[in-house]
């Protein structure tokens, strides 16, 4: 029986596919950037995703978010995203945190996500809207020496000063 990973195996080989299957990625934010990123990671064969967002899908999200449909309006983004990942890549483990990421709770939230992922995270993705939280996450990455992939979007912020 053909699986979604057959094409990945042809493209990457067994060793690289195995590395993806063992990868653990933490994504802060399930909005425009985060939902597309999480979808790509799931389709790419990543084995563990830890996702964090406090928002619900709104009608205004439909024009740009992978999880936003008329049928998902009003639902928690992390729940919709987790269901989407399970539908794309059933072997991907998803840990969903319905939490608002702030500079003030970032360390505690990171520690909880790290523990849930088995004490190791390969990459952290910043798909956060607020500049102060982005800065706090960058500082934490430097302090804890983890790989950070950061989107410089700012959600509705034309003049961030």
Regions found by a protein language model. Give the residues of each.
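N-terminal charged helix/coil linker that caps or initiates catalytic domains
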Residues: 1-26
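Conserved N-terminal Rossmann-fold NAD(P)-binding element of oxidoreductases
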Residues: 27-29, 52
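Hydrophobic/small residue at the entry helix of a nucleotide-binding pocket
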Residues: 33
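Glycine-rich phosphate-binding loop and adjoining beta1-alpha1-beta2 segment
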Residues: 46-89
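Hydrophobic/aromatic anchor residues within beta-strands of the central parallel beta-sheet
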Residues: 94-96
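Conserved acidic residues
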Residues: 98-100
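Short amphipathic alpha-helix with an adjacent loop that forms part of the alpha/beta core around
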Residues: 104-119
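E1/E1-like adenylate-forming module used to activate ubiquitin-like modifiers
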Residues: 123-161
